[in-house]
């Protein structure tokens, strides 16, 4: 009968061990209280041998299942440590007089460790009552080690191997401590023994072995982010950091062997895939990208749903998603992480390292007034009002992911009562667009956020106008939140009910939106003042160029040409009167030295003969009844006697003039242009 009772207890413990739930572990660890023995020692040697053998079998089973989660890994470590203690302290019996105090301390630590387990309150109270009814003198250290270490006369605890698995490293100080004041020293002693044990941790090969070893000792501080490693061959998660439990609630090893994209929201999977496909060619071009270059984007990740207790049943929790900022880094798989019989050429087996950081709402209280130093975010939209770019900094302020806004009309996010203000704002945008790089700040206006509320924005507007077509290309708004929304959590689902607006107001709002889009599609005109300034500047440049061109002609070249015109003058010779048309030329207006050429022809009739001479050539013949002619060049004089007449005409230039000869100064090109 004794053997049957012990066998039934061990069977219940093994079933609880396979179930893995905290409730079964706790119930299995104290099942000895109802076995009929009340925790009293057994005097049969066969029972002792069976206990030792069963505990060793449990240790081997735990070593085989080392990848079952963080709690299982700690249990494996504790079992390995207890095995090492078994060989070291085989002959040392432990005192067993402080079991009640140790049980109370361990109960408190177990309540803290398993405070979030889904066990029912009645089961917990029943467990505590069973622990108080135990009259044992059993040692807590014997339960931690899980083996019998004394002879037949020594007290043995009732076999409960599950008590080893539920004790985390932080609770190790319960074993061997007689009062609560010595708890810290017991913890230090257990840590020291655990580290010195030969079966402390099995070496982990593959990605993330170092990070896996750091999270096993002591109390772990909650982290705000987690990292995971994904194989680019099939998209399977190879490793996750322990902080995934704090961030998303998943057990540490629950993601292993599953596709990462299964945990991404459906609407964000296309964005995730595009980031991967664009990042792979960049990562393959070695040397062109820095080693730590990352691409960041935002997605929604699924949170661990789990189950919650509701009376005697469980109720499924709704699936929820949380926004995260993902940083992607492509790495080549390490050589030692590959199997020995499978070698891959360099560059073909790549790993994707993802660092996920949760995005929190920027607001803490409803209708929060933010300071002037609050961060800004930019939203760019085209001339048709379609959003083309959103900063990732807008996620915490508006609740939208960038891919949620891109492709939508920005007019849908303005409050219907502020559309008239926005129409004036865009009129100013078109006027400022006449000057490149001009910006201005508009009046505050309300903007719709993800949870259905509105925030008050202050915006600095800039625009870009195509210099050739004079068309508006896009408008950029640098926004800053002036007043927060009524609901602080911007990531909550928007209410299904919509704001009721009259048909007249809806038609008016639609008309204003159409007017804004038409205004943005118009050609940006240049101001008249700018045109006048450009024409005046061009005239001045042309006149300056022509003056420079005329200055290149030297005054000496102009002197060789013809000068101003002088007045005609008369002069008288000794015996003849010559009528001469005189032309006087000069540059500076003063008479110069000239050379005159004259030709004279004379005809005389008389009874005598006459001879005319002059400078140059001239001949004259005369008979009494004949005629005489004479020609001459230059300044000539002629005399004749007889009854003949001789006349001479000539033209030439003289060195001086009696007429009024006036010099005309040169006229510049600018003056001539202005005179014309």
UniProtKB/Swiss-Prot annotation:
Motif Nuclear localization signal per UniProt: ranges: 53-66
UniProt repeat feature Sequence, residue ranges: 589-590, 592-593, 594-595, 596-597, 598-599, 600-601, 602-603, 604-605, 606-607, 608-609, 610-611, 612-613, 614-615, 616-617, 618-619, 620-621, 622-623, 624-625, 626-627, 628-629, 630-631, 632-633, 634-635, 636-637, 638-639, 640-641, 642-643, 644-645
Regions of compositional bias (Basic and acidic residues) in chain numbering: 108-120
SMART domains recorded: PAS
Entry GO CC: nucleus; perinuclear region of cytoplasm
Broad class of the protein's primary localization: nucleus
InterPro entries: PAS, PAS-like_dom_sf, PAS_fold, Period_circadian_regulator
Biased composition (Basic residues): 53-66
Biased composition (Low complexity): 1-34, 644-654
Molecular function (Gene Ontology), one example: transcription corepressor binding
Key words, A-Z: Biological rhythms, Cytoplasm, Nucleus, Phosphoprotein, Repeat
SUPFAM superfamilies: PYP-like sensor domain (PAS domain)
Keyword Transit peptide: no
CDD domains per record: PAS (cd00130)
GO BP of this protein: circadian regulation of gene expression; entrainment of circadian clock by photoperiod; negative regulation of transcription by RNA polymerase II
Function field: Essential for biological clock functions. Determines the period length of circadian and ultradian rhythms; an increase in PER dosage leads to shortened circadian rhythms and a decrease leads to lengthened circadian rhythms. Essential for the circadian rhythmicity of locomotor activity, eclosion behavior, and for the rhythmic component of the male courtship song that originates in the thoracic nervous system. The biological cycle depends on the rhythmic formation and nuclear localization of the TIM-PER complex. Light induces the degradation of TIM, which promotes elimination of PER.
Assembly and interaction partners: Forms a heterodimer with timeless (TIM); the complex then translocates into the nucleus.
Domain comment, as recorded: The run of Gly-Thr is implicated in the maintenance of circadian period at different temperatures. Deletion of the repeat leads to a shortening of the courtship song cycle period, and thus could be important for determining features of species-specific mating behavior.
Protein name according to UniProt: Period circadian protein
Organism listed in the record: Drosophila mauritiana
């Amino acid at each position: 009968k004794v053997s049957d009772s012990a066998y039934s207890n061990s069977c219940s413990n093994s079933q609880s061990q396979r179930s893995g739930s905290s409730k079964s572990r706790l119930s299995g660890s104290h099942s000895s209280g109802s076995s009929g023995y009340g925790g009293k020692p057994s005097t049969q040697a066969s029972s002792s041998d069976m206990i030792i053998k069963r505990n060793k079998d449990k240790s081997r089973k735990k070593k085989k299942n080392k990848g079952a989660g963080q709690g299982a890994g700690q249990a494996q470590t504790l079992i390995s440590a207890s095995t090492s203690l078994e060989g070291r302290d085989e002959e040392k019996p432990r005192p067993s007089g402080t079991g009640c105090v140790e049980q109370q301390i361990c109960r408190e630590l177990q309540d803290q460790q398993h405070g979030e387990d889904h066990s029912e309150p009645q089961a917990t109270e029943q467990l505590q009552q069973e622990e108080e009814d135990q009259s044992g003198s059993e040692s807590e250290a014997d339960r931690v080690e899980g083996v019998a270490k004394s002879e037949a006369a020594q007290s043995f605890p009732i076999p409960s191997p599950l008590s080893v698995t539920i004790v985390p490293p932080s609770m190790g100080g319960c074993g061997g401590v007689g009062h609560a004041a010595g708890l810290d020293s017991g913890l230090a002693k257990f840590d020291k023994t655990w580290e010195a044990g030969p079966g402390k941790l099995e070496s982990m090969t593959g990605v993330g072995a170092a990070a896996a070893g750091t999270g096993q000792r002591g109390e772990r501080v909650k982290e705000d982010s987690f990292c995971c490693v994904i194989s680019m061959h099939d998209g399977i998660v190879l490793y996750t950091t322990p902080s995934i439990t704090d961030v998303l609630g998943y057990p540490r090893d629950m993601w292993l062997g599953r596709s990462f994209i299964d945990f991404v929201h459906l609407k964000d999977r296309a964005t995730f895939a595009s980031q991967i496909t664009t990042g792979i060619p960049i990562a393959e071009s070695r040397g062109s990208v820095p080693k730590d270059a990352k691409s960041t984007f935002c997605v929604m990740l699924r949170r661990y749903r789990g189950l919650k207790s509701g009376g005697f049943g469980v109720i499924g929790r709704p699936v929820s998603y949380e926004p995260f900022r993902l940083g992607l880094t492509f790495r080549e798989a390490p050589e030692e992480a590959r199997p020995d019989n499978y070698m891959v050429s360099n560059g073909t087996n790549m790993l994707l390292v993802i660092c996920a950081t949760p995005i929190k709402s920027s607001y803490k209280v409803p209708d929060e007034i933010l300071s002037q130093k609050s961060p800004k975010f930019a939203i760019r939209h085209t001339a048709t009002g379609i959003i083309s770019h959103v900063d990732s900094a807008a996620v915490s302020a508006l609740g939208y992911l960038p891919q949620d806004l891109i492709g939508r009309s920005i007019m849908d996010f303005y409050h219907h009562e502020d559309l008239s203000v926005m129409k004036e704002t865009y009129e100013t945008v078109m006027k400022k667009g006449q000057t490149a790089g001009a910006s201005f700040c508009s009046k505050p206006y309300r903007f719709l956020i993800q949870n259905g509320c509105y925030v008050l924005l202050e915006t600095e507007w800039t625009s870009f106008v195509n210099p050739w077509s004079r068309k508006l290309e896009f408008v950029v708004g640098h926004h800053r939140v002036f007043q927060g929304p009524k609901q602080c959590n911007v990531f909550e689902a928007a209410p299904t009910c919509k704001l009721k607006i009259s048909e007249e107001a809806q038609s008016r709002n639609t008309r204003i939106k159409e007017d804004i889009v038409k205004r943005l599609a118009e050609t940006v005109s240049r101001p008249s003042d700018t045109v006048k300034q450009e024409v005046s500047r061009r005239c001045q440049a042309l006149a300056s160029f022509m003056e420079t061109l005329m200055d290149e002609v030297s005054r000496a070249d102009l002197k060789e040409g013809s000068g101003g015109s002088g007045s005609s003058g008369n002069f008288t010779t000794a015996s003849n009167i010559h009528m001469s048309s005189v032309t006087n030329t000069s540059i500076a207006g003063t008479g110069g030295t000239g050379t005159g050429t004259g030709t004279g022809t004379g005809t005389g009739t008389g009874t005598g003969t006459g001879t005319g001479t002059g400078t140059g050539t001239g001949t004259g013949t005369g008979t009494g009844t004949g005629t005489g002619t004479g020609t001459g060049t230059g300044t000539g004089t002629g005399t004749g006697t007889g009854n003949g007449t001789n006349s001479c005409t000539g033209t030439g230039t003289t060195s001086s003039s009696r007429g009024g000869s006036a010099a005309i100064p040169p006229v510049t090109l600018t003056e001539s242009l202005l005179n014309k």
